[in-house]
Amino acid sequence: IVDAGHELVYSLADNDIDLIFCFDPRPNNKGEWYQTMLNYKIHHGTPIIQRVGDCGTHGKPELTSLVKETVKHSNFIIFPSQWACEVIGYEGANYEVIPNAPLPIFHDFKRAESTNKKVKVVTHHWSPNPKKGYALYEQLDKYIANNDWLSFTYIGQWPIAYLPKNSEYYKPTGDNTFISEKISECDIYLTASEEEAGANHVLEGMACGLPVVYHNNGGSIPEYCGKYGVGFDSFEQMIDGIKEVNANYSKYKESVLGYEDQVPKAVSRYMEIINELSS
C-alpha cells in the first residue's frame, strides 16, 4: 500500500480516511471493531473492504454470526475460498474469491526427485485447535511404530496431552527458511485439518513441491489441493491415500511442480480492488 503511494493508518481517529480495510470485525487493541468502522462509513461516506479470513468454524460460533452480519454492510468482500463464502451464506455480487498464496521462500528448495526409500510424510501447524487434525496425527504416530515403510515429520504446535513418540518433531519457529527446507526434504504433505477458510499450510507444502493427502472436510483445502493429491475421510483412507500417491508419485509430483502461486500475485489483486474503491 505504501509502495503504491498511499498513506496507511491503523486507527479511525483521523477524519480523512478514504478507505477502510477490515480483516477482522472483532475489537482491536484500541477497542475499535466493525461497528466503529460502520459508524465512520455512515458519517464520512468511506467505503469498507472486508476480507473474511476466519469464519469461526474452529469453535467460534459467535464470530460466524458476526461475520454473517457485517458482510451485509461492507462495500466489497474478499473471501479466501468459495467454501468460506458458502459457509457465511453470502449471496451478494460484490465479492471476489482470492485464494491465499505462499511466500516466495517456500518455492526455493523444491526437489524434482522421486520418493525417498522410506516414504517421508510431513505437516506443520501453529494452532493447537483439535480441528487441525491431531487425533489422526496421533494415530499416525502410533502406526509408524510398526510400519517402517513410512516416516512422519511434524513441525509446530502439538497439544500437550499427547506428544509424538515415533515421529520427527520440531517446535514452532518463525524461520521460514528452516520450515521450507524441512518440508522440501519430504515426499508427501499431509493435512488432517478440517473446515479451514483459507489454509496456508497446504499452499506452503505445495510450493515446496509436495503432493498433498488431505481431509475431504478441509473446507478450502480440497479447493486448493484437488489437482495435486488425494482426499480422505478416515484414518484408513488416509493411509490408503499416502500409498496411492506413493505408487503414482511421478504423476502427482509433476502436477504439483506446476503450482507457482506466490503472495505478490494475491497482493497485486488486492491493490487493484483497493484502487478501484478508493478512486
What are these regions (language model features)?
Residues D3-H73, Q82-W83:
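Extended catalytic core of nucleotide-activated donor transferases of GT-like folds
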Residues K60-P61, A101-K118, K132:
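Acidic anion/phosphate-binding donor-loop and adjacent secondary structure
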Residues N75-F109:
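Donor nucleotide-sugar binding/catalytic pocket of nucleotide-sugar-dependent glycosyltransferases
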Residues A112-K132, E138-K142:
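Conserved donor-binding/catalytic core segment of Leloir-type glycosyltransferases
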Residues E194-E195:
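Aromatic "clamp/platform" in nucleotide-sugar-dependent glycosyltransferases that forms part
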Residues G226-E236, K243-N246:
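Conserved acidic donor-binding segment of nucleotide-sugar-dependent glycosyltransferases
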